[in-house]
Amino acid sequence: MLMNNADVRSQERKQVMVCARAAHRVAPIVAQLTSADKNAVLLDAAAALEAAGAEIIAANQRDIDQGRARGLSEALIDRLSLDSARIAGIAGGLRQVAALSDPVGEVVGGSVMPNGMQMRKVRVPLGVMGMVYEARPNVTIDAFGLALKSGNVALLRGSKSAQHSNAALVAVVHRVLESHGLPHEVVQLLPCETHESVQDLITARGLVDVVIPRGGAGLIEAVVTNATVPTIETGTGNCHFYIDRDVSDLDQAIAMLLNGKTRRCSVCNATETVLIDSALDSAYQLAIITALQEAGVTVHGDVAQLEAVGASGIVPADEHDWAEEYLSLDIACALVDGVDAAMEHIRTYSTKHTEAIATGNIVTAQRFADRVDAAAVMINASTAFTDGEQFGMGAEIGISTQKLHARGPMALPELTTTKWIVQGTGQTRP
C-alpha cells in the first residue's frame, strides 16, 4: 500500500528524532575516544572508501541518471559526480585529518589563583553536530572525518539528489566503525524525502548541539532563520576586489583578480565584484575590464560608465548584481571614488566573507583592513586564499561569516568548545 504525503512526513519525522536521540546517547562515547582510536578509524575509512570505489560509483551513477532525468544542469551534475580520482581525493582528505593535531583536551588558558586553586580552560567536543548540505557527496565524508577527529557525533542531512551516493559512502563508514567496535550512530544519514526533515533537525533542541548549513544562500538563510538549535552560518561569498589608485603593479593586481574569479568560480571565496578607483588612468581601467573579458568572464556594470573608458560588451547591471554571488564566470564591475567609496559599497553589499584590496599605499591598506567588516581581509592577495588549508589550519567544514561562535575557516578547533577545570585542595569561598 502506497503511503500518502502525511504518512511519509510522519515517518520521516520519527526517523529524524530516533536518529537525534541515538546521536545524543552515543556522543559521550565519541568524546572519550583517544587520538589513536580516532586516527585508526579515519585511516581505515580512507582505505575502505578506495576499496569500495566501484560500489560508490555505481550508487553515484543512479543519482546522476536521476538528476539528468529531472533536468539538473551539467554544472550541478559535475558537483554531484564521483569517480576514482574524486574518491581518492576524499580518502586523502581523511588521511589529512588523521595527521592533524587533536584539539580535544588542549589547554588553552588557565592560572593559579591566590588561594592556590589551579584553573585550566580546555577544549571539549561540541557534542552532536548536524550538517545540512546540498548535492556534494564529498561533504558527507568531510563532515564525518572532522566531526570524529574533534570528538563529535554527526547527523547528516544531505540532498535528495545525492541520496544514493551519500548512502553508499555512509555504509562504508559504518562497516569500518563496526570493525572498531564503535556504534554506527557515530555518523547517521537523515531522511531527505521532504524539505521538512531539515526543520526536524534544526529544531531538535536538547538533542542536537549545533547545526552547520553548507550550500547556497537560500539554504543557509532558511536554516539560520528557522533553527532553534544553535547554528554556525557558513558563508555565501559576495567577495569584492578593490583596485586602488595607488596600486603598485597593475599586472599583478589583474593576476590576483583573475585568480580570484576564474580559478574556481563556483566556490564561496571566488571574487564576485571588482571595484576600480576612478582616479586610475582610464587606460588602466580598460585593461582590467579587457583582461576579465579575455579570460571568458562576463562583466556586468553601469554601461555608460564603463563604455566611457572604452569598454564594450558590458551587460547592464541592476541592484541584484551588486548583491549577487554568481558562482559562475560573471562579475559585477563599478568605478568608485577612492577607498572610502569602495568601503561603503562593500558595507552595503558584502556577505562578510572575504574582501580584498590591491594597493601600494600602506596607509590605505591599513585603513581598508581596519574598517572593512569581513571574516578575512586580503591585502595584495587573491580572495581564493580564504581556505582552511591555505591558512595552515588543515581541513575545514566551511567558512563562517558570522561572529559567534567561530569566524572564518572552521577547522578542528572551531568544532570544539571549552570548559573550565578547577583543581582545589579543599578551598571554600568566604
UniProtKB/Swiss-Prot annotation:
Record SUPFAM superfamilies: ALDH-like (SSF53720)
InterPro entries documented for this protein: Ald_DH/histidinol_DH, Ald_DH_C, Ald_DH_N, Aldehyde_DH_dom, G-glutamylP_reductase_CS, Glu-5-SA_DH, GPR_dom
Biological processes, Gene Ontology terms: L-proline biosynthetic process
Entry's Gene Ontology molecular function annotations: glutamate-5-semialdehyde dehydrogenase activity; NADP binding
Assigned keywords, A-Z: Amino-acid biosynthesis, Cytoplasm, NADP, Oxidoreductase, Proline biosynthesis
Chief place where the protein resides: cytoplasm
Cross-referenced Gene3D superfamilies: Aldehyde Dehydrogenase, Chain A, domain 1 (3.40.605.10), Aldehyde Dehydrogenase, Chain A, domain 2 (3.40.309.10)
Domain of life: Bacteria
Keyword Hydrolase among record annotations: no
Recorded catalytic activity of this chain's protein: L-glutamate 5-semialdehyde + phosphate + NADP(+) = L-glutamyl 5-phosphate + NADPH + H(+)
Location relative to the cell: Cytoplasm
GO CC annotations, alphabetized: cytoplasm
Keyword Amino-acid biosynthesis belongs to the record: yes
Enzyme Commission number(s) from the entry: 1.2.1.41
Pathway field: Amino-acid biosynthesis; L-proline biosynthesis; L-glutamate 5-semialdehyde from L-glutamate: step 2/2
Record-stated family: Belongs to the gamma-glutamyl phosphate reductase family.
HAMAP family: ProA
NCBIfam families: PRK00197.1 (NF001221), proA (TIGR00407)
Function: Catalyzes the NADPH-dependent reduction of L-glutamate 5-phosphate into L-glutamate 5-semialdehyde and phosphate. The product spontaneously undergoes cyclization to form 1-pyrroline-5-carboxylate.
Protein name per UniProt: Gamma-glutamyl phosphate reductase
Organism: Corynebacterium diphtheriae (strain ATCC 700971 / NCTC 13129 / Biotype gravis)
Gene: proA
